[in-house]
């Protein structure tokens, strides 16, 4: 399934994602989803919007609207619900909290690797243009 046509940072990210999903550990899946995605995306999108609005707001009004809407929904609804879900799933079980922490950290590391790889690929393409 994981062939050479995809860069390593993408393969690593996808492989981990599917390992988590197929683990069937609902508290781990919820933690990775919450802390590896939902909890960080609003802040990430805010930074993207700030950079997009500098020169190109008219050209990118639809994507800016998408980001702003995503920030609103994640910040006001999804984020708090996801945190509540983690609390309910892990409860007072310290082992579940440890697993949630371990897998959330790995998810964040792999997401950073994914974005770093994307930036490197983009810079390499620009340097050859």
Task: Give the ranges of each region predicted by the language model.
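Non-heme di-metal
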Residues: 3-129
């Amino acid at each position: 399934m994981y062939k050479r046509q995809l860069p390593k940072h993408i393969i690593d990210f996808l492989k981990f994602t599917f390992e988590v999903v197929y683990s069937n550990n609902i508290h781990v899946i919820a933690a990775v989803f919450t802390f590896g995605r939902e909890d960080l995306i609003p802040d990430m999108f805010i930074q993207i919007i700030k950079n997009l609005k500098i020169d190109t707001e008219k050209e990118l009004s639809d994507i800016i609207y998408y980001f702003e809407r995503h920030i609103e929904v994640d910040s006001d609804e999804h984020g708090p619900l996801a945190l509540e879900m983690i609390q309910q799933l892990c409860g007072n079980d310290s082992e579940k909290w440890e697993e949630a922490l371990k897998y959330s950290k790995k998810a964040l590391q792999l997401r950073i690797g994914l974005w770093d790889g994307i930036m490197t690929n983009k810079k390499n393409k620009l340097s050859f243009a």
